């Protein structure tokens, strides 16, 4: 913790007021990053009229959750008690929003009637799946880039207007 306090240029006492342990600090930091990513995604789609365009933009920003901002914490997160529950909470919220956008796309007749929950689970889980250490080694690109490629393929495949 003293190394972290030194790097952040805050007192150790201040750091312990923020989080009582390194593990809690990491969980709080990742929680904040994921919350900010969600806020950014919602802000980006608020003025977009097409549900499918919203979905594309929302998932692109959501896939940033496995980008450089969180990469440095990957190994630590897998070891920290409570971290997976926090990640699951954010991922479940992400999947619910994707499901909602898919339902809106059906109502807007941008896509055919589909099992929106099944598709939402795939779109909302790709990035986390690709961020697993044993999977990262097999990818030709970063988890974020790979997740965006697959997400784009799926969304284009769903679209009634093939691009």
Model-derived segments and spans:
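Short coil/turn helix-boundary motifs
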Residues: 22, 47-48, 69, 161
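Secondary-structure edge/capping motif, primarily at the C-terminal ends of alpha-helices
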Residues: 44, 70-77, 130, 134-137
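C-terminal peripheral helix-coil segments that are non-catalytic and often amphipathic
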Residues: 57, 64, 96-108, 124-126, ...
């Amino acid at each position: 913790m003293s190394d972290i306090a030194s790097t952040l240029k805050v007192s150790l006492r201040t750091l312990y007021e923020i989080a009582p342990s390194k593990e809690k600090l990491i969980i709080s930091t990742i929680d904040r990053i994921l919350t900010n990513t969600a806020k950014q995604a919602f802000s980006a789609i608020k003025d977009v009229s097409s549900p499918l365009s919203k979905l594309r933009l929302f998932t692109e920003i959501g896939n940033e959750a496995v980008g450089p901002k969180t990469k440095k914490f990957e190994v630590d997160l897998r070891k920290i008690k409570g971290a997976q529950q926090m990640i699951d909470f954010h991922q479940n919220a992400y999947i619910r929003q994707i499901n909602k956008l898919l339902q809106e796309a059906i109502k807007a007749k941008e896509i055919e009637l589909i099992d929106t929950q099944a598709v939402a689970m795939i779109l909302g889980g790709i990035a986390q799946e690709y961020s697993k250490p044993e999977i990262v080694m097999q990818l030709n690109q970063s988890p974020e880039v790979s997740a965006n490629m697959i997400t784009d393929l799926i969304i284009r495949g769903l679209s009634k207007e093939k691009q």
